[in-house]
Amino acid sequence: MEEAKIPMLELGPITFNLTLLAVCIVTIAVIFAFVFWASRQMKLKPEGKQTALEYLISFVDGIGEEHLDHNLQKSYSLLLFTIFLFVAVANNLGLFTKLETVNGYNLWTSPTANLAFDLALSLFITLMVHIEGVRRRGLVAHLKRLATPWPMTPMNLLEEFTNFLSLAIRLFGNIFAGEVVTGLIVQLANYRVYWWPIAFLVNMAWTAFSVFISCIQAFVFTKLTATYLGKKVNESEE
């Protein structure tokens, strides 16, 4: 059996997974299209698509209000909204279709089902919260937080690393497992013709459950981002 080849693009020392890049672009395009469509012809009394958009904004604002000081919440509301939408769409992208090459490589998958992508996303969040902590509180005050109380400094540093790692692995594990089970259900339909109706019903139920779990994971990811950010920028954390 011929080994499945992953489409790659090499630019100097950096190698890009073209499939991952493509589904990321699709994710961004879906988000842009939704926000653009929902924000057209807005009315004083919201209805339909405008109501859906405003509900999402209010929902994410609520996450920020729980973990960020009042005077800082508005500064990060758009960031949290973008993170929530991106993770939610990315989580669900691979649930509804599958495009395989003749070698068996899947060209259509959720970006968040890729561990390298999740680690990169988690690294971005980790660096961002530390940069914001330095920008808001100053380098000395930021480092002081990591060394308070000073006997716990090694544990505080370990906590920063485990936060980064758990943020990525939690997301990857849930989304990857969902796509694996979906693939197994599809294979069940191909096993015998009389299994097709059962596989169809099971797949519909599993897809609905996976969409729910994917949205929960987007909520958890956004909430943890707001939590980590609040610990670095809030004055109350002094």
From Swiss-Prot:
It comes from the Bacteria. It is found in: Cell membrane. The keyword Lipid metabolism does not apply. InterPro entries: ATP_syn_F0_a_bact/chloroplast, ATP_synth_F0_asu, ATP_synth_F0_asu_AS, F0_ATP_A_sf. GO terms for molecular function: proton-transporting ATP synthase activity, rotational mechanism. SUPFAM superfamilies: F1F0 ATP synthase subunit A. Its main location: membrane. The chain crosses the membrane at residues 18-38, 76-96, 114-134, 166-186, 193-213. It holds the Pfam family ATP-synt_A. One of its GO terms (biological process) is proton motive force-driven plasma membrane ATP synthesis. Gene3D superfamilies: ATP synthase, F0 complex, subunit A (1.20.120.220). It is a multi-pass membrane protein. Keywords: ATP synthesis, Cell membrane, CF(0), Hydrogen ion transport, Ion transport, Membrane, Transmembrane, Transmembrane helix, Transport. The keyword Transport applies. NCBIfam families: ATP_synt_6_or_A, PRK05815.1-4. Key component of the proton channel; it plays a direct role in the translocation of protons across the membrane. F-type ATPases have 2 components, CF(1) - the catalytic core - and CF(0) - the membrane proton channel. CF(1) has five subunits: alpha(3), beta(3), gamma(1), delta(1), epsilon(1). CF(0) has three main subunits: a(1), b(2) and c(9-12). The alpha and beta chains form an alternating ring which encloses part of the gamma chain. CF(1) is attached to CF(0) by a central stalk formed by the gamma and epsilon chains, while a peripheral stalk is formed by the delta and b chains. This is ATP synthase subunit a.
